[in-house]
Amino acid sequence: MESIVDKQAVKHFLLQLQDKICQQLEATDGQAQFIEDAWQREPGEKLGGGGRTRVMREGAVFEQGGVNFSHVFGEQMPASATAHRPELAGRRFEAMGVSLVMHPKNPYVPTSHANVRFFIAEKEGEAPIWWFGGGFDLTPFYPFVEDGQHWHQTAKNICAPFGSEIYNEHKAWCDRYFYLPHRNETRGIGGLFFDDLNEWSFEQCFAYMQAVGEGYTQAYVPIVEKRKNTPFTERERQFQLYRRGRYVEFNLVLDRGTLFGLQTGGRTESILMSMPPLARWEYAYQPQAGTPEAKLSEFLVPREW
């Protein structure tokens, strides 16, 4: 039996999720608050819809971060999307999601990213084509094994009710996706990543997306609380800025969401919200052997946690 697709329930959940995550991150920071920029597409634009971009700046813990909700729709998919999925041609579509990136001030606190999204393409008289996607991943500068274990154990616990292989599959997908081939390293220590999820019933797929979205703060906040008061010097700060450069490289060169958004006339400020406020590059930099900075490379390969 075809399950009922409830777009409104998904949108309601995503708006609540944005509120909840912002509240939890504000409590963790203890100083700064998210400033909301609500936006709407102009009439006559290719895409309709709008969203709520929320940005935190110069907090006690977070140097900058953003939690974005968007819901956009159009009469037909861009050619770049239908080239790979011809069944989407001639269908009106809607895409909605919450995406976030948090860039902490303290180099001992990892950067984190999370995203959950829903896509549906509809045509009169035909069954809708829909899927869910999402995940979360962690990018430490000074990694701790116990933090990685907590992050991945939380991910395992989220996946367990949905099947014994889900964690392994979505963890491996995350390792493959957040990989910089020109640097031969992963962006961080991974987590979960999934896309095109529609093989279960709508209810089951939606439940998994909800679990991943709500699991992000369970995975991240305890690590932030543990590391946010660690003393650091200018050396660690400079290394953090250098490593943020890799984050920029991934987002601008490789990230499908960023590229799709910019190529299809998405809202540029919201798309580039994920960028760090400061980053640096240094020609042919190599950390000295035996230093904490050199240790990071051991973590930037897929591993079992």
UniProtKB/Swiss-Prot annotation:
Its cofactor is a divalent metal cation. GO terms for cellular component: cytoplasm. It comes from Vibrio cholerae serotype O1 (strain ATCC 39315 / El Tor Inaba N16961). Residues 247-282 are annotated as: Important for dimerization. The active site is at residue 113. This is Oxygen-dependent coproporphyrinogen-III oxidase. Pathway: Porphyrin-containing compound metabolism; protoporphyrin-IX biosynthesis; protoporphyrinogen-IX from coproporphyrinogen-III (O2 route): step 1/1. SUPFAM superfamilies: Coproporphyrinogen III oxidase. PANTHER family: COPROPORPHYRINOGEN III OXIDASE, MITOCHONDRIAL, OXYGEN-DEPENDENT COPROPORPHYRINOGEN-III OXIDASE, MITOCHONDRIAL. Signal peptide: none annotated. Its EC number is 1.3.3.3. Homodimer.
